[in-house]
Amino acid sequence: VLAVQSLGSTVAEFEDQPQVSLSNWNGATVRSGTFDDQNGIFWQYDGGNLAAVQRTSTRQITGTVTATPDSNSITGDGTRFREQLKAVDRIVVRGMTHVVAQVNSNTQMFVTPDYRGVNVSAGVKACLVLDKVAKQSEFNLDTIDGNGPSGYNFDPGKMQMIGIQFSWYGAGFIDFMTRGSNGDFVFAHRMRNSNVNTEAFMRTGNQPVRLSLIHI
C-alpha cells in the first residue's frame, strides 16, 4: 500500500486492539436486502453514498425480440432499441438476465452472456431491469446523518443493523429502517406504491435475503 499524503507518524504506537476501517472507496458497491438480478429491495453503499433501492423488471420494451441459443445477438420486430436501451442496461428474455453490450440499431443489439435457451425464442417480450435509487439526502422520513428527527448518524465504518418492511404485491409501502441509538428502529425512507403503480413492482415476493459486493 502506498501513501498518497503525508503520514502523521511513521512510528505509530498501537493500543490493545488496533483497527483499520475502510469507509470510502471507488468502483464497488455493497448491497444488502432481499433481491436478485431482476427484482428486490435493498440498501446500498458505494463508498461515498448510502441509498435505498427498489429493483423492478416489469417494464416491457416496445415490440418483440428473437434470441438464438449460444448467440449474443438479439433481433427485434417493431422494437426501438436505440431509443429505449443503452450499453450496460440489463434486460430479461424468457426469465434470463442479460447485460446490453452494444446497440447497433432499433432492431439489433448484442448482449452478454449468450442466450442460454434450448430452442430459438421468437416473438417474445423483453423487459428492462430498473433500479429506483433514493440517496440518503433524499430520504423522506429521516436522513440519518445526525440532522433528522432521531438525531441518529449512520456511520458506514461501523456495524449497523438494517431493516426493510414491504408488501410485495405492488400496492403497499416499502419502509427502509436502521436500528437507532436507543435500540428502536429508525424509519429512514418510505417508498409509496399505492395510487402510483399500475402493476406489481416485483414479479415475485419469493426473494433471497443476501449481502453482495459488486464491482462497477
Label every PLM stretch briefly.
Residues T107-V111, A171-S181:
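Short, surface-exposed terminal/edge motifs of secreted or surface/virion proteins that either
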Residues I214-I216:
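Conserved small/polar residues in nucleotide/adenosyl-binding loops
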Residues V1-T58:
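Secretory/extracellular carbohydrate-interaction modules
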Residues N206-L211:
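Noncatalytic modules at the cell exterior or secretory-pathway interfaces
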Residues K132-M161:
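Short, aromatic/His-centered strand-loop micro-motif at the edge of beta-sheets
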